Amino acid sequence: MEQVGMIGVGAMGLALLERLKLAGVQAIVYDTYAPSLEQARALGCRIASSAADVARESTLVDVVVRTDVDVIQCVTGPDGVLEGAKPDTLALIHSSILPQTVQQVEAAAQSKSVFVVDACMTGVPDTVRGGNLCFVVGGTKELLARAEPHLLKMGKQVFHMGPTGTGAVAKLIKNMVSGSETLIVYEAIQIGLAGGIPYPKALEMMREIGHDSVLNRWQRTFDPSGENPLPKSGRNVMNKDIPLVCDLAKLYGLDVPITEQLGRAAARIVKANEER
């Protein structure tokens, strides 16, 4: 049975600890913020004095810190995980960071015979508490098999994306899609406002009339064989409607840089499809 440690018990870390408690797992934890440690103590966790001390008493360490610098420091720095970890310890990096950072940490860990997997989280604390967290994971199939039972105590689904670092890439592109939708909707309602449409009415219309994420029908938009990532142009959308809305924004004198870039991207896709 794995002995579980956790570095970083902020909002996400505490939510993960709640799930682990429900599964009967008592973790040893460390954080630089004392009030968070007291909340972890209230959940029945043991408190360590450093990341190294967590690793000394663990076979599996969840790393739930915020930035690339934080990950490097708490794993490879003084009093970090690698200073205390025994051979065959598995470090699961849950932070949203660059894949190159994951690979840098993995390279440092190899000298200590410590394994590293990026197991990035797709959700917020309420998602975790509701048991709906998903993990996108990069690492070998053997390490995935070891990590998955632990991950499923904290979430509902694990997606293996490929080798080390691909979990981090997957998290970033997933958030890229989510964030870009918000930004383009903002530009769309600016165009609607300029055309006399109150934005709540525009948003309600777009929600009710045929708005469907491309992800729900990606096999119709992209080649499902995986051989060609070029999207199909779509009847009248990329070759007519997107250019028209770009013209409309110019007529209104609006600064909509994402829409303008979409117009250029649509033209390239239409041309590429014509040349196939």
Predicted feature residues:
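Rossmann-fold dinucleotide-binding core
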Residues: V4, S96-N175
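Hydrophobic beta-strand scaffold residues
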Residues: A27, I47, F115-V117, V158, ...
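Rossmann-fold NAD(P) dinucleotide-binding segment
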Residues: A51-V63, T67-F115
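NAD(P)+-binding Rossmann beta1-loop-alpha1 motif at the extreme N-terminus of oxidoreductases
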Residues: M1-V64, P125
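Helical "substrate-binding/catalytic lid" subdomain
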Residues: T166-D255, Q261-R276
